[in-house]
Amino acid sequence: MNIKRNIDELIGNTPILEIPTVRTDWELYLKLEYFNPAGSFKDRTAYALMNAAEKSGKLKKGMEIFESSSGNTAKALAMLSAARGYKFTAIVDKHAPADKLNSIRAYGGKLHFCTDEEDPKGGHLVDVRRRAAKKLAEETNGVNLDQYDNPENPKGFYNTLGKEILEQVPDIDYLIGTIGTGSSLSGSGHYLKEHNKDVKIIALEPKGSSHFSPRGHGYFISGPGYPAGAILPKNIDTTILDKNDYVSDKEAFNTMRFFGEHKGLLVGDSSGMVLYYAMKFIKEEPVSEKINKMVLIISDSGESYLSHAFNDSWMIEKELLDKQITKDLAEFYI
């Protein structure tokens, strides 16, 4: 009997699910990261950052952790803080999904809401959040783990996610994921390319994000991406990326709804992005005699998006429902 003794042991070693498509020359694998205890791949981030801070002596029992997050990192830190005896405050803003905020509270975490007017230095709200997290940590003798620039973040994905993917799909040809702090793809991508330089790494961001384009605009996708005008994280390593591209709110959200209703997979917005893009990418590729193996990082569960992407009224109000996208998905994912 495989009995675990603490929450830490539940992080990682997530399953891979193969799903069929109309293209018999492709094998499509989903790395289901929502099997982590707090429900996303950011459990790996929290685990790596907290372990490194404890080992260095920066984080000690009874201290409070302050972190800027749109939701999943904060959920993971709140969970591990509760398990390890730390206090935790998430620095959030008005754009954070209510479902994620409720989860943070459920783990005993506190919320500090930032506004555009809070910091006299101005700048984008993401930068305001990041500065607020550092300021609160300094004022209270707490700790800001800084998921954006802390090299332990991509290192954690290198040591775990990259290794697991290679063990589960040794002859992988493509890895597709979304990019926010850049840590998951930078870390796992490095690991894969060290073992097979021919593996292609594709990074996706929401249409409107500014990782690879200075011209950004607003979007509803809440996990990946980076708003125009915000200071980009240092953890993004573009040298391992073979391609970058964009997926719209409409494409991601309708894909989420399709997989919930027709495949029994309740996935989040970044997962909707990779599932839609995989279809688009494969359909544009010529038929091959070789079997191509593609792994998609399914970052989190759709349970954190019930109030918007899975809410009919919200989707209608934002004019995001699209029957053609659903039809295309049904024809590809058999």
Region spans (language model):
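PLP-dependent amino-acid enzyme catalytic core
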Residues: 1-334
